[in-house]
Amino acid sequence: MSENSSGTPVVRTMAPADIDRVVEIDIKVLGKPRPEYWEMKFELVGKRSQISSLVAESDGKVIGFIIGGVSRWEYGVPENIGWIDTIGVDPAYQRKGIAKILFTEMTNSLKKVGVDTIITFVKRRDPNLLNFFNSLGFRKGDMINLFQNSPDSAIHCQRYQNLNI
């Protein structure tokens, strides 16, 4: 059974069998494949705790996912900080509260291990995602994204720096 008695999708730990469906949802949402990204993500998911990757399932089908976890002192961020790396919901199931259900389940699990702050990165020109995270109480933080587009190569660097304001 993949829905509870109220018809709400079941949230569970992501399993290796979910990978193809997660990638399919990501392609539907973004409009392009990201094989290198997902290869790296699934390698990390396998090494992290079970709270770091969840899926929402309805009628035996994965309809959404969230990947995140607890800081391991990346960028000097302490362990009481949680991250949302990636969240996606099949377009056919969007605007039905699935992403909020996934987010709530993950944050409840993160709180149990001492996380009291969640961080994510969003493109400033993505109003839908910004509105979603704003509706969950997110606001601008102290981290900034620095980007360098080198004219001599195709390498793009993203550097994150903590501002001491």
What positions do the PLM features span?
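Active-site/acyl-donor-binding loops of N-acyltransferases
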Residues: S135-I155
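Conserved N-terminal entry element of GNAT/NAT acetyltransferase domains
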Residues: M1-A17, S153-I165
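Conserved active-site alpha-helix within GNAT-family acetyltransferase domains
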Residues: K100, K112, R124-D142
